[in-house]
Amino acid sequence: MADEVKAVARFIRMSPFKVRRILDQIRGRSYQDALIILQFMPHAATEPIKKVLESAAANAEHNFSLDRRALVVSTAFADGGPVLKRFRAGDRGRARPVRKRTSHITVAVRSTSEVE
């Protein structure tokens, strides 16, 4: 059986710095606790993270017949993706660069029986 079951969301149009703030809050928590935390946080980054977490739990349930209630978030991280470079009008007719960052979000879960 797999040690960890993971799910990845790539090219999410959000800064990795903002996503990591949320991931730090759910790392090491149970699946149920992580969902509750994400549900009540007032940040936009919680939506894609919640989708990835639910996908990882579905992978564990479907592929390895693990119980969702017995899952723990073992790994959660966000890497930087490609940066979209845009320009905004600046002073004196100049153009100022704007870097629209993207993220790759990875969440891995494991069964609590494996953690102990």
UniProtKB/Swiss-Prot annotation:
Question: What keywords appear on the UniProt entry?
Answer: Ribonucleoprotein, Ribosomal protein, RNA-binding, rRNA-binding
Q: Which domain of life is it from?
A: Bacteria
Drop me one GO molecular function for this one. Answer: structural constituent of ribosome
> Which InterPro entries does the record cross-reference, listed alphabetically?
Ribosomal_uL22, Ribosomal_uL22_bac/chlpt-type, Ribosomal_uL22_bac/org-type, Ribosomal_uL22_sf
Q: CDD domains annotated for this entry?
A: Ribosomal_L22
From its record, what is one biological process in GO terms? Answer: translation
The answer to whether the entry has keyword RNA-binding is yes
Q: What's a single GO CC term here? A: cytosolic large ribosomal subunit
The role this protein plays is: This protein binds specifically to 23S rRNA; its binding is stimulated by other ribosomal proteins, e.g. L4, L17, and L20. It is important during the early stages of 50S assembly. It makes multiple contacts with different domains of the 23S rRNA in the assembled 50S subunit and ribosome. The globular domain of the protein is located near the polypeptide exit tunnel on the outside of the subunit, while an extended beta-hairpin is found that lines the wall of the exit tunnel in the center of the 70S ribosome.
Known partners and oligomeric status: Part of the 50S ribosomal subunit.
Q: Which family does it belong to?
A: Belongs to the universal ribosomal protein uL22 family.
Full protein name: Large ribosomal subunit protein uL22
Q: Which species does this protein come from?
A: Gloeobacter violaceus (strain ATCC 29082 / PCC 7421)
Instruction: Identify the gene encoding this protein.
Output: rplV
